[in-house]
Structure formats: structure tokens, C-alpha cells
Regions:
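Polar, low-complexity export/assembly segments characteristic of proteins
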Residues: 1-36, 48-168
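Stable alpha-helical elements in mature extracytoplasmic
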Residues: 35, 39-43
Length: 168
């Protein structure tokens, strides 16, 4: 793709992207790109600079894989609201592999148990059941974490928690 500089003024390089359910304005590439890194940076800047997306704090990270010659777009949001899709892509964008058919995998809310009780997942945060001994505790799962079998976490209140309960 980048054996020679890509001059996007010669064709229509435009698209719309939906991030977490919000559709952008029409985004158009209008420069000459000597490397994939230049185009990756420009795509990320144009998408994250879009007024509609900025208005709802929706943003993406754009990456380029030299081995496959493809760009990837990852929402910075977490959980099941995290989605990325394209629409209104021009033929020139489709020739680069960015087309209306390109739909990302929807994110998932974290799931798990605390002290053997099913927690409530909201994005990357796992919360204990309301009123449980662990109430007030929250666990944040880092981006890219994946389960390799079962993970168990047990919780016990410390002396301060016990004293607080006695004072109430």
C-alpha cells in the first residue's frame, strides 16, 4: 500500500465511522501519505477530532499491521457499549480495506464473582451485590485482560470496617 506515496487528492477518500453508537460527520483524507504511520496518525486525529464524536467523548485508537497491511480501529470505551463500524465509505477507502462491511466485535461487560456471589459488571468495573459484605469494593479489569481459567477473589472486612459497623 505504501510502496509509493499515497496522494488522496486524486480520488475521494471519505467515510463515516460510528463509535459506541454515535455516527461521525463525513471524514475525508486530503493529504499525501508517505508511510502507513503518517496515515494512521491522520486517521486517528480526524476521527477523534470529529465534533459529533467529541461531543459524546467517543474516541478510537488506530493501529496499522505491517504484516497484514490493514488498519484496525479500537474504541477507547469499555464493555458492551464499545462498538466501531463504518458507513458511507468511498470506493477508494474500500480499496484500502476500510468499507461498510468492516464491523468490529462488540465489547463485553466484565463478569465474575466476589466471595462466591455473582457481581455486577459495568464496562471494565466489577461491583459486588448491593448490601453484601463486599459492598463498596470495586474491581477494575485492565484493557486486554483475558481469562485463563477461573480467577477467585475473596474479601474480608478489616478492623476499620468492623468498627464502622459497630458505630452505626
Amino acid at each position: 500500500l505504501f510502496d509509493t506515496p499515497l496522494d488522496t487528492s486524486l480520488e475521494d477518500y471519505s467515510f463515516r465511522i460510528s463509535v459506541n453508537g454515535t455516527r461521525s460527520n463525513l471524514i475525508t483524507l486530503s493529504g499525501t501519505y508517505n508511510t502507513a504511520e503518517e496515515m494512521r496518525a491522520e486517521l486517528q486525529s480526524l476521527i477523534n477530532g470529529d465534533e459529533r464524536l467529541k461531543g459524546v467523548n467517543a474516541a478510537v485508537d488506530v493501529a496499522y499491521d505491517d504484516a497484514t497491511g490493514q488498519f484496525s480501529f479500537t474504541s477507547r470505551d469499555y464493555g458492551k457499549t464499545s462498538t466501531v463500524s463504518f458507513s458511507g465509505t468511498s470506493a477508494a477507502m474500500a480499496n484500502m480495506g476500510i468499507s461498510d462491511d468492516l464491523v468490529g466485535t462488540q465489547g463485553k461487560d466484565v463478569q465474575g464473582t466476589i466471595n462466591g456471589v455473582k457481581g455486577f459488571g459495568a464496562g471494565e468495573v466489577l461491583l459486588p451485590e448491593l448490601g453484601s459484605d463486599a459492598y463498596g469494593l470495586n474491581l477494575t479489569v485492565r484493557p486486554g485482560a483475558s481469562s485463563q481459567g477461573a480467577f477467585t477473589m475473596n474479601f474480608s472486612q478489616g478492623v476499620s470496617g468492623e468498627l464502622s459497623g459497630l458505630i452505626e
